[in-house]
Amino acid sequence: MAKVGITELAIRDAHQSLHATRMTTADMLPICDKLDKVGYKYIEGWGGATYDSCIRFLNEDPWERLRKLHAALPNNKIMMLLRAQNLLGYKHYADDVVEKFVATAAKNGIGCFRIFDACNDPRNMECATKAAKKSGVDVQMAISYAVTPFHTNEKYAELAKTYADFGADSICIKDMSGLLKPYEAFDLVQKIKAKVDLPIEIHSHATTGLSVATLLKAAEAGADWLDTAISSMSMGTSHSPTETVVEMLKGTDMDTGLD
């Protein structure tokens, strides 16, 4: 086991989960100076429903938000959640649109693309992944976690191997429903680690109350990075509190080292 990194979700997935993505750019900017000094692996700040919400509900330019966050977080890489061929919309887009969108996002401040397909179909992820690799920033490919007779840890590990072959820089286990149990997480991380030599990040919502224990067991199994949200933006349908996870690992060989 080694030092664990933390991705902070407060200004993207946390408010998307708790407040229907209604946090404005003006709400975010005052805290950015403090966030920038904490020492996170990534700060997730764009993508998901934020693009739609900016335009549909907040009367904001999502690209201007990205540029402002990039300027306000000079010491951090901003992560975005990208729906692969769907980009940030609700249908498949042409390859040339995907390529241009990804290049423009990288140019405006994205430092890591977390790319997922809800069907876990690598064919839907190939174009976005190639475009992200070409942009020169970090590329994380996500496994959408589900519990069915078909979705076994062995199949997820094989999927991770496919992602590695695509050129992923890291793998995310994306548990968007909070269904990943602690000991299942331990087994899943170990199985993926046996297949690929890449960092693994755990994204697990707190909806079912399992997430804190799940993050701990995943870290014990060798997960490299964990997704959390500042306590005021945590729990419920959001994520485990950053402060709780940092304190939980403090003094161990998994110590995050965060202030």
Q: Which residues are covered by each model-predicted region?
A:
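Catalytic cores and adjacent flexible loops of soluble metabolic enzymes
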Residues: 1-114, 118-259
